[in-house]
Amino acid sequence: KYGDIWCPTYDGQACLFDVETEKFIDVLQPLEYATKHSNHVVRIQSLKKGVAWIICENGYTYRADEQLCKKGEGITLYSTFTQNLKGEHIFTVYQDSDEDEWILTNKGVTIVGSKAVDTDFPFQYITQIKENIYLVADKGKLAQYNFRTKKLKFINIPCPHNRINTIAALGTDTLALGTDNGLILFSAHDNMFRQIDIRTSTQPSNYVEQIYQDRQKDVWVFPRNPGIVRLHLNSNEKEHLFTPQNEVIKHGRNSRKLIFEDKTGILWVLPTGGNLSYYDRKEKKLKPLLTDIDNPKSIFSPLVRFYTLDTQGNCWLATARG
C-alpha cells in the first residue's frame, strides 16, 4: 500500500525496505528482544490494506501494520497456542472486498474482520466473485460463502478429477479450477460446470499447474509438459506454444513459471521448460527477448528464482546472478 518492499532474508528475517529513508528495517527484532524468542521467517504475505502476515516456523505467525511496524509497534502474534488461529500451518492469507482477512490453515479458516465462518475444513485456495467467497481443497472439495446469507455451503463438482492444483477468478462471473484432469469452469451466474481438455497434438498432459487470464480475455494454462496452452473460451480455440528444444537455454535447474502483462500491454511468458518470451498477438507466436535485435542468438532468458510485480507494472526478477 505504501510502496515499501518486503524482503525475507536467506537467514529467516523479515526486512522491510522503507522507500522514503532507503533503509532496511528488521521488523521482528524489537519483539524478539522483548520476548527472548527468535523467529525464522518462511514467507510474507502483504495485503492491499497495508497489513502483512509474517509466517514463521513452529506455528508462529505475526500480523503487522505496515506503517506502525517500522517503529516496533502494531505487531500481533497469531498461533494455536494464543488461541486466535485455527491451525499451525497456513496455506494462504486473502483480503476480500470488505477488507476482511481470511487465513486458511490445516485445521480450518480464521477470519480477522466482521465475518465469521465455523469450519475446520483444510481449504487451501480462495478467491472472490461478486459477493461470494470460494474456498477449495486440493482433494476436490469446493465451498461457497455468501456475504448476504453469511453461510458456507459445499458445491458438488460433477466433472471427473482427483486433485485441484490451483484456482482463479475469470472475469466477474467464472471460477476456474486447475485440476489433474484439465480445466474446470464454474459459472457463478447459473451454477453450471464445464470441463476443458487442455491436451493438443503437441501437448499430451491434461494436468493444470497454473492459470492466468490476460486483458484480451485469453486464458493461459501451464501444463506439466514443456510450454503453455492458450485458450479462447468463446471460440474453443486451443493453442500450445513452446520454446523449440534446440533454442532452450539450459541452466541445470528449472526456472519458475512466469506470466504477466506490462503497462504497455505486452504479454510476457516464461513457459515450462522454455525461454523468457513475449507473445506476438498478430503472428500468435512466442518470441524470445533479444539483447541485440540484429543477432537472433542474443537471447536473454535468465534462471528465475523468484519474481514480484510492482504497482507500476514492472516485473522484478531474482536470478541466479542477482
Role assignments for model-derived ranges:
Residues 1-322:
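Carboxylate-rich, polar loop motifs that coordinate divalent cations or form catalytic acidic clusters
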